[in-house]
Amino acid sequence: MSELKPAAMSVFRLAADDPMTYVQAWKDSSGGKAIALFPMNFPAEIVHAAGALPVVVQDDPTPITEGRSLLAEFYCGYTRSVADQAARGRLDVFDAFVVADHCVQLLGAVDVIRWVRPDKPMHFAQFTSAMDDAWTQPRVAGRIEDAKREVETVLGVPLTSERLARSIAVFNENRRLLRELYDLRRSGRAWITATDMQTLIKSSMVMDIQEHTRLLRGLLAGLDAPAEPREDLVRVHLSGHFCHGPRPELLDLIEETGAMVVDDDLYTGYRYIATDVPESGDPLAALSQWYLDRNRNAPCPTRVTTEIDWDTYLIDSIEASRADGVVVLMAKFCEPHMLYYPELRKALDARDIPALLLETEHEGNPIETVRTRMETFIERIRRQPAAARS
C-alpha cells in the first residue's frame, strides 16, 4: 500500500484519468487557451510563458472505434488512440497543436488531426535526432526559435526572456519535487506504488504547473514515516513505453505478484522529469541545451548521442536502485523499441540481470497470462542466491 494520502492523490488522479475534463475546466475558469503537445521532446515552458496551458496528449483507454479507418492496425496503440480521439472530437478542446517529432507513426497520427481539424494551427518543430554532430546545436536552436515565433503568433503574446526564465524556473521546481519522490522510493524511505507514481507524472503533463507544484509540496509534507522495508518483495525496475503510460491495471498486477517497483525509465515516469533546463544565460539557448541533455540523462532509442547508450544507462540505474530485475514494457508495434531491444537484452544477459519482456496493447492485454509470467519471473529471482540479488 502506498504511503501517499488518498485525499491528496484525488486531484492528481482526476487530471491524469480524465485530462480533457481538466483542460476544459481550466479554460472555463481562466479564459486562457490550451495547446496540445505530443511526446516527447517539446519544451512546455514556451507555451506556459505565453500564458496558455501546455498539455501532453495522453492515450484514451476506451476502445478505438472511428480511428480504425484512419491509421493502419500496425501503428502503435498510442498513435491509433490519438487518431481516434481526433475523429471523435475529443481533441477539440485544444486551440493548437505542437509536435517535436521522433517517430514516423506519431507523424501519421498528427496528419490525421490536420485532416480532421484543418482550422487548428499545427506546428512541426522537427528536432534533429543526431544529438552531437557539429550542426546539431545550431539546428536545434533554430527550431526552438521557430517554435517561439509560432507560439507568439498563435497566442498573440510576445515571449520575452523574462517570461521564459520564469517559466523555466517553475517547471524546474516541479521536476525537482517529483524527483524527490523518486529518490524516496529508491532509497526505501517511502513506498509509492507504480500506479501512484505514474499518476503524479501524468497529472504534471496536464495540470496547471503552479497548481501541481503547490499540491506536490503538500503531498511531500504529509508523507508518513516509512514502514519497515518489506524484505519479501522483489525490487524491480520498469523500462520502456516512450509515449504513453502503461495501463494502471498492468502496473497493479506487477506489484500484486510480489514485486515492488523501485525505479523506471518510462516516459510517464522518470524519463519525463530527468532533466532540468539551465536557469542562467539566454532562455532559448537553455531550452536548446535541455533538449540535448535529455538524451544524456535518460537515453532514448529515437535519438543518437555518441558514447551514450540506453543499455549502459539502464544497467547503471538498476545498480543504483538495487533492483533485482527489470520488466521491459514494450508497446506493440513500437519500432524504435523493437529495433533496440536485442542490444538491450544482450547487455542485460551479459550482466546476469533477470529481465522479462511484456508486450502491451491498447486493448485486449492478456492479464492472466501476464500474471502467470510475472509470478514465474518473481519466483525465478527469489531462487537466486542472496548475493546475486544485491
What function would you assign to each model-found segment?
Residues S2, R13-S29, A36-M40, A44-E45, ...:
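Metallocofactor- and cofactor-centric catalytic cores in central/energy metabolism, strongly enriched
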Residues S2-K33, A141, E145, R149-D276:
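A charged, amphipathic alpha-helical module
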Residues D311-I318, A323-G325, L329-S390:
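TerminUS-proximal long segments
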Residues M40-N41, E45-Q58, H241-T306, W310-I315:
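Redox- and metal-dependent alpha/beta enzyme cores, enriched for Fe-S-associated oxidoreductases
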Residues A34, D95-A96, G325:
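Structural motif
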Residues V93-V112, P299-I318, L329-R345:
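Cofactor-cradling patches in redox/metallo enzymes
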